C-alpha cells in the first residue's frame, strides 16, 4: 500500500535523489513543499496533478513562478551558474524550475541594465512598487494595501509623525534666499512643478502643506540650480530634496547605463549598479531613515531606492543593489568600499545630496567625501546638481560648498543654528552626584505618557543609566556606537513603538533621527559643542509639535555658558540667574564655539559670498599658529584671514589659542609655547 501512496506530487517509491529513470511524460516536475497546496489545489487523493504550463504564470517580480511575487529580484539566484539559474534553499544547483524560463523583456522598467536594474525576466518590482518606464512614459504599478500600511501607517498611527498644532506658524519664519535669479517659492504640492504620482504619495503620507524649506527648495531644484539649504531641525529637509529629485525622475525617466566589457552575468543582469541619485549622510540611523522616506515617495514607481552603511552584512546589501538601484542612500565609508569592489559606478549621477554635511566633516569623513565627489567617476560639478542640507552651516562648510557647488542658491529658513520656539527649554543646576535622583524626580513628574530621550556623553554611562532606570522600574533601553546594528535597530523600534518609552543615547542618535512623538529630551550630560545641544533638543518639537527640553548644568559645563545664554534668549526662553552669574565670573573661559572653534560665529548661517571676506581663496594658514589671538584661522590679526571676521567669542578663537578654553585643537601653551601636534 505504501508503494502506491503519493503525497501531493511526491511519490514515496520515487526517490528525488536517485538517478533519474528514462524520461516519462507522465511524471510531474518537482514542486517545493510550500507550493504544493496551491499548485495541486489540495489534491491529496493519489492522483498526480499536471505540471503547470510553461510561460509567465505568477506575475511580476517572480524569478521562478512562486506565489506572492516569489523571491523578489532573484533571491534564490545561483551566482555560480553562468545563467543565474535558481537553486534550492540548501544550495543544491540541480533544482530545476517548474516552468520554462521567460525571455528577458528589454522594455521592463526602463531598458536593460539601467541604473543597476538588471532585467531579471518579466518586469521585476522596482522601488516600493512595481511601476515601469515604458515608451517614454511612467506607468505606476498597482496599489498594494499591505505595503501601504507598512509605509504610511493607518490614520492616527502613533508611530507616524503628524503635523502639530504650531505647524502653521512656520509661515511666519523669515526666509533668506541669496543668489541670482532665485525662483519664486511654491505654496502647495501641485502640478506643476511636481509630478502627479509624487503628489499622490505625498497625500498618502498625510502631508498637507510644504514647509518653508520645501517651498523654496522644490522650485530651486526643479529649475536645475544647486542649493545650500539651512533650516530648523525637524522642518522637512528630507522632503526638501526627495520631492524634486523623485518628481524629475518620474517625468524624465531612467538614464541608460554605459556598456560594460564582460560585466554581465547574462539575461541583462549586471554586476555594477549605476544610480542616478546619491544621498550621503553621516550615520547608519540617518541613512536608514532617509531610505524609509524614499521608499514612501517611490511607492508604485519605477524608481528603486537602496541603502548601504557600515556595520551591517555587506552581502545582503550587494544583493539589494544587484536587484536594482536608482536612488542610493549611503554612508561615505561603505560607499567607498563598494566603489573599490567595482559594484557601484557614479558615472550616471545626476543629483548629489549631502545631508548633515557639517556632522560628516566633524566625524572625519572629509577625505572620503572628497574622494567620492572628486576622485571617482562622478560627473563634474557642471554636469550634475549638488544639494547640501543641514541645520547648521558654519563658515568652513560654506567654503567646502565652493568646491562642490556651482552658482548655488543659499537658503536660510529661520535663524539656522537656533532652536525651535516649539520647544520649552529648562536648565537646571545639578551636580554630577545628584543627577540620578533629579532624573527620577523628572520622570515621576512627567510620567511615561510620551517618549523621553536622555542624552549622555559616554557609552558606559548609557548602559549604566539604562540599567539604573530598569532597576527603578522605568522601561528604558540604550543606544550607542558599541551596540551591534541589530541591537540599535531593535532599541529604536521599541522606542518608536512606545513599548520602551525611555531611550538613553549617546551622540550617535543625536542628529538627523526623526523619531515621532518625542515629548521630552533630557541632556543628562551637556555636550561641549552648542551645535550638538541644538540638534539633541531638536529631536522633540518636530513638524510643529511641542516638546520639553531639560538640561542638567553645573560648573563643568561653563565652556558653553555664553552660547547657551544666547540660544535661550534667541528662542525667547527663560534664562536662569545662575547662568548669568557663571557667565560673568567665568569671562576668562569664553565660548569654545563648537568643535575646533568653528561653531556659532555671528555669521555662521549667512551666505559668505555676501560677507566682507567673500569666498575668495582658501583660508590663510600662514603668519601665525592655528590659534593666533584675534585671527579667525590664524591669518594674523583681526580681519586679515580670508574669512574676514574674528571669532565671536575670543579667548584664542579659531582652532585653538592661548585661552583656557580657547579651542579644541590648538596649542594649549599659547602661540609662544611648544608646537602642538598640528
From Swiss-Prot:
Q: Which InterPro entries match?
A: DEAD/DEAH_box_helicase_dom (IPR011545), Ded1/Dbp1_DEADc (IPR044763), Helicase_ATP-bd (IPR014001), Helicase_C-like (IPR001650), P-loop_NTPase (IPR027417), RNA-helicase_DEAD-box_CS (IPR000629), RNA_helicase_DEAD_Q_motif (IPR014014)
Top-rank lineage group of the source organism: Eukaryota
Q: Tell me which SUPFAM superfamilies the record gives.
A: P-loop containing nucleoside triphosphate hydrolases
Q: Which PROSITE patterns match?
A: DEAD_ATP_HELICASE, HELICASE_ATP_BIND_1, HELICASE_CTER, Q_MOTIF
- Locations of Gly residues compositional bias? 62-73, 112-130, 587-600, 611-641, 649-667
Pfam families to which the protein is assigned, alphabetical: DEAD, Helicase_C
Single Gene Ontology BP annotation: spliceosomal complex disassembly
Q: Could you tell me which CDD domains the record lists for this protein?
A: DEADc_DDX3_DDX4 (cd17967), SF2_C_DEAD (cd18787)
Q: Which reaction does it catalyse?
A: ATP + H2O = ADP + phosphate + H(+)
> Looking at the keywords, is Hydrolase present?
yes
Q: Which GO terms describe its molecular function?
A: ATP binding; ATP hydrolysis activity; eukaryotic initiation factor 4G binding; G-quadruplex DNA binding; G-quadruplex RNA binding; mRNA binding; RNA helicase activity; RNA strand annealing activity
Q: Report the protein's function.
A: ATP-binding RNA helicase involved in translation initiation. Remodels RNA in response to ADP and ATP concentrations by facilitating disruption, but also formation of RNA duplexes.
* Family recorded in the similarity comment: Belongs to the DEAD box helicase family. DDX3/DED1 subfamily.
Q: What is the name of the protein in this document?
A: ATP-dependent RNA helicase ded1
